[in-house]
Design a protein with these regions (language model features):
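N-terminal mitochondrial targeting presequence
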Residues: 1-33
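S-adenosyl-L-methionine
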Residues: 33-95, 105-112
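Class I SAM-dependent methyltransferase "Motif I" SAM/SAH-binding loop
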Residues: 100-104
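Conserved SAM/SAH-binding beta-strand->alpha-helix loop
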Residues: 125
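Conserved SAM-binding loop
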Residues: 132
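Conserved SAM-binding strand-loop segment of SAM-dependent methyltransferases
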Residues: 138-146
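Conserved beta-strand signature within the Rossmann-like core of class I S-adenosyl-L-methionine
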Residues: 196-202
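Class I S-adenosyl-L-methionine
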Residues: 209-214, 218-263
Length: 263
């Protein structure tokens, strides 16, 4: 409405437009555009189905060995892990895993933030990784299936200091719980492999509340009971670690962080 009104005014000559330059009309149009963008990105919050989360976690913990045994490691993931292992062993530095790194922007940012650490970004999508993003000498980008990668990490002698899981696919429909990491059969592998700290960010607070509940239940069942949850809390100044985080910040969509820390 505001944009079309501005177009109509432009046909009446510059004098009628002059009072609005940089003023209320432009500000209102910008505000409306921001509201539209926020409505596109925002996912409605809802109450966590505690019983459903607990039931799934109990099943996955009880059947985890069966899940691992019936699933062969993907060949490309085995090769990628070999590369990761050699890279990590060549450096005497704390190891950080950027799980689901997408185009590698977050891996680059983390490598710059932690120059004395080794940062390995892992994503399943060759298309995203093929963007050709350059990373510093302390970083590496690899294509691999995360479930298999975590399994190989757990079977290796590598020690992970911290894992970042930034803006994973939320699969927002209620029936999609099994597709979210907290409801997936690979959850025990993730918790075992994440190291001393797991940092998760999302624009959907419900996702993080659900993950916190799942991790707590897994801890009760003996899967990383040493991990203590902090959050989720809203980030006051998100730094744009990923393209999603940058989009959300521009659209005025709040983003949240959950930290699981070894204590």
């Amino acid at each position: 409405m505001l944009i079309s009104m501005a177009r109509r005014c432009s046909t009446l000559g510059p004098r009628l437009l002059r009072p609005y330059r940089g003023g209320a009309l432009r500000a209102a149009a910008l505000h409306a555009a921001t509201d539209d963008a926020a409505s596109i990105y925002a996912i409605p919050e809802r109450d966590v189905d505690e019983a459903a989360v607990h039931q799934l976690v109990e099943r996955h913990v009880a059947q985890h060995a069966t899940y691992l045994n019936k699933r062969p490691i993907a060949k490309h993931t085995a090769a990628a892990f070999q590369t990761a292992s050699e890279f990590a062993r060549s450096r005497t530095a704390p190891l950080i895993i950027d799980a689901g790194c997408g185009t590698g922007r977050s891996t680059l940012k983390l490598a710059e933030r932690y120059p004395d650490s080794t940062v390995i970004g892992v994503d399943r999508s060759e298309a995203r990784l093929s963007k050709g993003r350059r990373v510093p000498a302390n970083a590496l980008l690899l294509r691999a299936e995360l479930g298999d990668f975590w399994r190989l990490l757990n079977d290796s002698e590598l020690t992970v200091e911290e894992t970042f899981l930034l803006y994973p696919n939320p699969y927002p429909k209620t029936k999609m719980l099994k597709q979210r990491f907290q409801g997936h059969a690979s959850l025990p592998s993730l918790l075992h492999a994440c190291g001393r700290r797991l940092t998760i960010r999302a624009s959907w607070r419900t996702y993080l509340e659900e993950f916190r509940l799942a991790a707590s239940k897994a801890g009760e069942l003996g899967i990383r009971p040493d991990l203590v949850s902090k959050g989720p809390y809203e980030l006051s100044e998100p730094e744009g670690l990923t393209l999603f985080e940058r989009k959300y910040a521009k659209a005025g969509v709040p983003v949240y962080e959950l930290v699981l820390k070894c204590e």
